[in-house]
Amino acid sequence: QRRDREVVAAYDLRSGLQHWEHGWTGLFQESMGGPGPRATPTWSDGKLYPLGALGELQALNASNGELLWRRNILEDAGVGNLTWGMSGAPLVDDGRVIVFPGGRNNKSVIAYNAADGSIAWTSQDDQGGYASPQLATLADKRQLLYFSGKRIVGLDPADGSLLWEHPWYSNNDINSAQPIQVDDDHLWVSSSYGHGSELLKIVHRGDGFV
């Protein structure tokens, strides 16, 4: 955060000199976390994908900071911001940039085409969360995982279709810790404020997963 702008900057590792800077107007702040973006920019195939706390998603040329395309994920989902802002880092997979704004109308999870920012697919009606979407292979199935304010969910990353879900209710719906894959079938989830943790076993049963 630099005054009223969210900023992405690149520095030389040896000298510390700034190579380039790119920013946009936006100031998110609240008393506990302070001002500024929360999510770590994601690098993939020569491009950088920063997500601002107010939902501004951009694709940049990583070598010079040139803007390639932009979207606002909250506007695309038709949903308001979370109390502590957009925090989950974008996930890049198979030519798509996947984010989790939360919301209704089957737009909780949005996959954008990395080439031009057009929407590839949307999925789910869910409350937003603070953890980043992630990939895992569980029960011999490659999956897209996201941790909402109410549940942990596994989707097919190709089209966003639901594979399985497990309810997870915590104080104030604050789920911010990344789920951890323990082995080929088990996933560990946890939440703060005294809620605790669970070890889940994902099983392929019939045509689906539990």
Provide a role label for each language-model segment.
Residues 1-210:
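Noncatalytic, solvent-exposed loop/strand surfaces
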